[in-house]
């Protein structure tokens, strides 16, 4: 058999974020769970990976003050926030045959923010 499991985490699960202990803990937990499942299910031909989006221009971000958004852009090597399609491409890749040997990975789609 074979299959794909693609979990959703967040870059804050990798680097932490002030004042968000509960959110950071759950997203870091998803990364750990992804690694364990990759080991357990890999023998059955199932790959397990995670996508960790960075700050992405969605409706949720519309309430963030422009000053904060500017600060995020300034800290991001690519100089912008992500678009939903940027995140979607990571999922498409992990679901594809081209990713058949990728297992236990967390892909950070963040424009380099976590470097």
Q: What are the language-model segments listed below?
A:
Residues 13-15, 115:
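Conserved catalytic-site region of short-chain dehydrogenase/reductase
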Residues 31, 52-63:
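Short, flexible catalytic-loop segment of classical short-chain dehydrogenase/reductase
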Residues 6, 48-51, 61, 104, ...:
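Hydrophobic structural elements of the Rossmann-like NAD(P)H-binding subdomain
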Residues 10:
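Residue(s) in the substrate-gating loop at a strand-loop-helix junction
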Residues 62-76:
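A short C-terminal helix-loop "cap" of Rossmann-like NAD(P)-dependent dehydrogenase/epimerase domains
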Residues 50, 74-98, 102, 111:
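C-terminal helical subdomain
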Residues 39-43, 100:
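Alpha-helical segment proximal to the catalytic Tyr-Lys
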Residues 26, 34:
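Active-site helix of classical SDR
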């Amino acid at each position: 058999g074979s299959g794909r499991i693609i979990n959703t985490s967040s870059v804050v699960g990798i680097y932490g974020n002030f004042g968000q202990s509960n959110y950071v803990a759950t997203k870091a937990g998803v990364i750990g769970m992804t690694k364990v499942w990759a080991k357990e299910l890999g023998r059955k031909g199932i790959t397990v990976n995670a996508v960790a989006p960075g700050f992405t221009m969605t409706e949720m971000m519309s309430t963030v003050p422009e000053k904060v958004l500017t600060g995020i852009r300034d800290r991001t090597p690519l100089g912008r926030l992500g678009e939903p399609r940027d995140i979607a491409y990571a999922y498409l890749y992990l679901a594809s045959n081209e990713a058949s040997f990728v297992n236990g990975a967390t892909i950070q789609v963040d424009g380099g923010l976590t470097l």
